[in-house]
C-alpha cells in the first residue's frame, strides 16, 4: 500500500491530477457538503477543478499521515489560499482560506478506492464573512 502525494497533487492546481490519485471508479465522499458523493475520475476531477478555480492559489499542506494495517490511510491536511472566484453561496471576497480537514482513504495498491473527507464548514463560512 502506498500513500498518494495528496498535498503535492492538490497543489498542482489540476483537477485531472487530483483524480489520478483514485481508482477508475473511485469514490470521494465530501461529508461536510452534506454528503456529496463523487464517483469516478471524471466527477472527482470536475469537483476538484471547481474548487481550484475558486481558490486558484490554493496549497494543501499535510500535517500528518497514518497508515492502518487494513489498507486505510488517514491524512490530516490544511487547505490554504485566497478565495478569489465565485462559487454558489460563496461569493468571492478575496479573503484568506485556512481550512483544516481529515481524509480517511481506503486504498487499492497506490490508488484511493474510497475517500471520506471531513472539514469544519463553520470555520470556512466564518472566514468568508458568511457566519457571524
Where are these regions (language model features)?
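C-terminal and inter-domain tail/linker signature
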Residues: 1-132
Amino acid at each position: 500500500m502506498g500513500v498518494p502525494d495528496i498535498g503535492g497533487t492538490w497543489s498542482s492546481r489540476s483537477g485531472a491530477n487530483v483524480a489520478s490519485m483514485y481508482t477508475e471508479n473511485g469514490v470521494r465522499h465530501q461529508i461536510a457538503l452534506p454528503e456529496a458523493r463523487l464517483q469516478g475520475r471524471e466527477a472527482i476531477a470536475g469537483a476538484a477543478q471547481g474548487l481550484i478555480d475558486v481558490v486558484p492559489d490554493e496549497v494543501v499542506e499535510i500535517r500528518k499521515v497514518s497508515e492502518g494495517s487494513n489498507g486505510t490511510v488517514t491524512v490530516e491536511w490544511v487547505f490554504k489560499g485566497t478565495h478569489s472566484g465565485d462559487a454558489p453561496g460563496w461569493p468571492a471576497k478575496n479573503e484568506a482560506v485556512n481550512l483544516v480537514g481529515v481524509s480517511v482513504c481506503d486504498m487499492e495498491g497506490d490508488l484511493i478506492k474510497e475517500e471520506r473527507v471531513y472539514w469544519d464548514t463553520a470555520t470556512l463560512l466564518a472566514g468568508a464573512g458568511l457566519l457571524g
